[in-house]
Swiss-Prot record:
The gene is rimK. The keyword Ion transport does not apply. Keywords: ATP-binding, Ligase, Magnesium, Manganese, Metal-binding, Nucleotide-binding, Protein biosynthesis. Its cofactor is Mg(2+); Mn(2+). Residues 104-287 form the ATP-grasp domain. Disulfide bonds: none annotated. This is Probable alpha-L-glutamate ligase.
Length: 301
């Protein structure tokens, strides 16, 4: 097979591992900088152009699109879909998962476990917003934040009100969520591929840090999932329409609660923690599905 990885940096661990795994399994793998692609939209023969010429026909693409370039990145993926190329994650599913609010609304509609969550832009009654999620301590998030940036823990209602007022001054959209104390600053990252959890790790926040992101000094270790946690992760991926994703879950007194679904999960932490060759599992899934044309929304929306 001929596979393209859409990535802005071929030296990133996840990109390198996917190239290695693809080549070891006998495939031709190219890394293409998403932002350097440009497209011929209106011709009867749609194409993606790169470095002054049309890209060759690929059997599959693996989008590794950063949050900051979601709009352009998904446009490139959509163009590949219009050309009949299989994408492990479709453009519409990536866009859906990048909208944190829409993701939460979709998962809530399906009855999946979520922390109590409020959404606001310029609330006229901040106290009522806090009361609706159970009061302090609360976690306040910028809707557009990634990797733990723009996430604040407010220990008291007074602190929470001050933070929300500051975000209001920035004209920002914010999420306010109940703080799950029993999680102890840890979460679980489940890697779902093809409707199955293929690997899982526990991420523990650094001392005194409630955010468990590895980018923020958190540590990763192997973990055994409960059947309910496994089901929750698989269902979250299904609701988002993602064939490959990282589902972040908190262990709470009310069962597993979903924090986020990531359409471009990093591989370094989970391969190190589990010892699994996750990259090869992803390529093998593509081998099984690329020619089935089983994607439901190809080239639409």
């Amino acid at each position: 097979m001929k596979i393209a990885i859409l990535s802005r940096n071929p030296r990133l661990y996840s990109t390198r591992r996917l190239v290695e795994a693809g080549e070891q399994l006998g495939h031709e793998v190219d890394v293409i900088d998403t932002m350097h692609c440009y497209m011929d939209i209106t011709s009867s023969n749609p194409s993606v152009r790169y470095d002054g010429k049309p890209l060759p026909k690929y059997d599959a693409v693996i989008p590794r699109i950063g949050a900051s370039v979601t709009f352009y990145g998904t446009a490139v993926v959509r163009q590949f879909e219009m050309m009949g190329t299989y994408s492990i994650n479709e453009s519409v599913a990536i866009s859906r998962s990048r909208d944190k609010l829409r993701s939460l609304q979709l998962m809530s509609r399906k009855g999946l476990g979520l922390p109590k969550t409020g959404f606001a832009h310029h609330p006229d009654k901040i106290g009522d917003l806090l009361k609706n999620v159970g009061g302090a301590p609360v976690v306040i998030k910028l809707l557009e934040g990634t990797q733990g940036i723009g996430v604040v823990l407010a220990e008291s209602n007074k602190t929470a009100e001050s933070i929300i007022e500051a975000f209001m001054g920035l004209k920002a959209n914010i999420l306010v969520q109940e703080y799950i104390k029993e999680a102890g600053g840890a979460d679980i990252r489940c890697l779902v591929v093809g409707g199955k959890v293929i690997a899982a790790m526990k991420r523990q926040g650094a001392e005194g840090e409630f955010r468990s992101n590895l980018h923020r000094g958190g540590t990763a270790s192997l973990i055994r999932l409960s059947p309910e946690e496994r089901r929750t992760a698989v269902e979250a991926a299904k609701v988002m329409g993602l064939n490959m994703c990282g589902v972040d879950i908190l262990r709470s007194n009310n069962g597993p609660l979903i924090m986020e679904v990531n359409s471009s999960p990093g591989l370094e932490g989970i391969e190190s923690a589990t010892g699994k060759d996750v990259a090869s599992m992803i390529i093998k899934h593509i081998e099984k599905t690329a020619f089935l044309s089983s994607t439901k929304t190809k080239g639409k929306g």
